[in-house]
Amino acid sequence: MNSQETEIDKEKELEQKVQEYWTCRAHDFSTVRKNELKDNEISGRWLAEIGQNLPVSSGLDILDVGTGTGYFAILLALHGHRTTGIDFTRAMLQEAEETADSYAANASFLYMDAQALDFPDNSFDAIVTRNLTWTIPEPEKAYQEWHRVLRPGGILLNFDASYADNVRNHNQKESYVSFKDVYGHCGITPELEKKNAEITLSMPGSCKSRPRWDIELLSKIGFSNVSVDKTAGQRILREKDLPDAPLFLIYAKK
């Protein structure tokens, strides 16, 4: 077996671990996102943050990459956009579809790899994604695909954080903060938290200086007007923003 085949096998193994983790978490994670949908204040903050970065307030074709249980896709569909959510975990998509039905939200959901999108070029006006890029084995490949399916002038809004920094502080009691403590995540056992830490530190982005690394990748791929807002978490999550892994917003235009 050559080095390239070995690398491919490692990536597939890592993807499988990610899928298994989120399959296990799907139902409990859905509870968290349903609570957010019910919370007009937090949903209003997300809508304000996204809306101020989009060219119009409704009627856009928007792709929610790594939709999970469908929060962004449902929220934006309820406010007049045509949304498609994709995810690589079927259990998450099942939760998303059930939640969308309960809200009568006109959002569609597809099983798809964020690194290999099954859409024609120039399909979407905007791409939104939340807490995804830290879970991707090949971020550059994903960014290239996102650039491809955006229409000219299309917008990428990537909300993420350098979660590896929080994991690395696990043994520093005064610094480390568990997701279940600040985000209200339920069903997280010590075993699941350990798996999450292992996955996080296995990803390429875990050893990079983020979001600077992302900015360099996006510029290299051909995005323009690339910028980062490191205070997004303070406005949206407020006291729930992780001190060691604050939420940032990466904006990029095709």
Range-by-range predicted roles:
Residues 205-222:
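Short alpha-helix
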Residues 126-139:
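A short SAM/SAH-binding and catalytic strip from SAM-dependent methyltransferases
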Residues 140-152:
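A short glycine-rich, Lys/Arg-flanked "PGG" loop and its adjoining helix->strand segment in the class I
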Residues 2-57, 71-75, 95, 155-190, 232:
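Conserved class I S-adenosyl-L-methionine
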Residues 115-126:
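A short acidic, Gly/Pro-enriched loop at the edge of an enzyme's catalytic core
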